Amino acid sequence: VGLVTVAILVTYPKLPPLDSVKYYQPHEPLTIYSSEGVVIGSYGDEKRAFTTIDQFPEVLKNAVIAAEDKRFREHWGVDVIGVIRAAISNASGGAKQGASTITQQVARNFYLTNERTMTRKFNEALLAYKIEKTLTKDQILELYFNQIYLGQRAYGFASAAKVYFNKEVRDLTLAEATILAGLPKAPSTFNPIVNPERARLRQEYILNNMVELNMITPAERTAALNEQLTYERYRVDVDQNSLYVAEMARQELFERYGEDAYTKGLKVYTTVSVANQKAATTALRSTLRSLSAGRAYAGAEQQLDFSSVEPEDIEDAAEQFLANTYTVEGMVPAVVIEANKQGIVAYMQGGKKATLKIGDMGIARNAIGNKKLGDKAIKVGSVIRVMKLKNGSWTVTQQPEIQGALVSIDAQTGAVQALVGGYDFHSKTFNRATQSMRQPGSAFKPFVYSAALSKGFTASTLVNDAPITIRGWSPQNSDGTYSGMITLRQSLTWSKNTVSVRIAQAMGVSYLRAYVQRFGFTADQIPPALSIALGTASVTPMQMAEGYAVFANGGYKVAHYVIDKIYDSKDNLRAEMQPLVAGKTAPQVIDPRNAYVMTSILHDVATKGTGAATNALGRSDIAGKTGTTNDFKDAWFVGYTPKIVTAVYIGYDKPRTIGKGAFGGKIALPMWINYMRFALKGKPVSKFVEPKGVVKRDGEVYLKERQTTDEHLPLDNTTDQPEAVRPLNPPKAQEQELPPADNGSAGERELRPVPSNAPSRSRGNSDDAANAFFED
């Protein structure tokens, strides 16, 4: 006794302070929301929802006390009676018993390890006593109920209720509560999904204890044991149309806060609405499906190896794999569990099976064991997509191989209004809106023509649309026809390649490369060749949207952003975006009059030229430009109103021909129209602001001091093929093909770090072309 007293006197003062339990801050996941508060993403290894003790039902509290600590309400942290009983049982060779109280488990979970030593047990007992002196019994229970690990990545009983039963903890029945109460002792051993028999034995033990403690009646125990329990896999209800945006926000949060981003319970509100996201996703998917119609079957998405799996366990293995898959547009992921010459049996999540005969397999009817498909041939273990038809039967389908992106931003602030980075985020998280570096073709020409206006050209400058050869390179118009002397306005309206090259030649490549960087492109993205006039730079759809925003907002460079506000776990505002705003804090990169003239020309493109299909929207405030690259590998349309800029792109991840005649105006523009029809619905037609210093004369728009072309420009209007030229007749509204040229390359754009001296809420002037956060 004397030694124990000395040990206590020596050890007790050295015990750690109880800040962790007094000021409990549980690990809570990062949650990302749309602008209106719909969950679009949840990240964190620990599934936990902090819940106050009064929100846990009495039936659960009683079940846990009956399971873990019968005398919880009476002891001082250590159950002396339980310790003596366990010691006698262990010494007599009986079943090994533990005697750790709930308070001791709290002490262990917060401060100690699980090592089985007398020193640890001694410290645990002293800590339990210290905790009992500091906190009330309900406070201790609250810590335990929120911190304890209960399997399936669930921490705390509120999370476990969701994970195992997909219900709120307050709604648990006695049977469900006693199943969960059995988990703390050994979450894996008593997992009701994996080990239902052991879980039931543990449940029966707890129910018997509850009867013994007069918490329930024998009849209630019997009813609970007879209750048929349904275990339902829980998934956070995340909007499936906003996953690319959520991932962008997650990456930015990780850059700012590191691993703490996933444990501090941050609540992040983004700039996108679920309605816009749905419209954007629908527009992109319907376009890509239409382009993929009639394409040959590409084969299984994946092959699972069942060679070491017993036949009776194949369905369980398939179920385990499918637990992390998602149905997209009615295309259900399935695993082939039987395959022969007559057909297949496809296993779907939840135990559903579909038997498909060869004739039912649609596009995949020749895919069983097909050597031409290699390892993508259908066999046992193949992961495929099936779809239910109107008559109730199933068939094999596939996701489009062709990909695309849509990004829509606020022209005045850069706030992302909608963003879709591909057909299916679950299949491939690569975000084509921000990461895919592709040639924009003629969609890049507006930047070239803006440079021309700055250099001394006007919208009415006459340039020869005629064959031209420069050091062995002969760019051509896609239809092989030439119109002779036409204005810059006409040239851009009908996307004339030879005119674009001539004006680039007159400006000089060095000047042109430097000028287009004003729109946000970097030098390494722009090849040092005249071919940049035809769009051989390597750019992302997001960069194109930001670039066109300069025209839309009157000459200011805004920067895109998706995070609007960040709150902590207690709903305190932690940070708020301070965007660069056109006309206020955003840097002016081109003359507002230049932007106005370019918008005037691009309005013609969108209403009379290659983008004339936009007339279907019945609006007078639209401007934009189509784009197509060589061999029809990429198709674009970027268009805008004074308030919204939307860029769309279509192409294969590994560039190849989309198909003959796949012009931007033919396949990309319809996607743009479908989205903008929704985005602009109910919004009044707005006018582009006419800046001071603009003159309108003879139906054309000029800068006041430049109403004629600079006579010193070295513009070459000669041609060695005059016979090829015909007077301008409005050609078909289609995009010009990009001739062979140098390819530029660039890596993913670097996300600028948020400056430590973030601007105040007053949004003072800033010369940096980057948004910043105001942090409280």
Show which residues each predicted segment covers.
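N-terminal type II signal-anchor transmembrane helix
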Residues: 1-33, 71, 91
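Short, well-structured active-site flanking segments
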Residues: 73-82, 155-158, 217-221, 430, ...
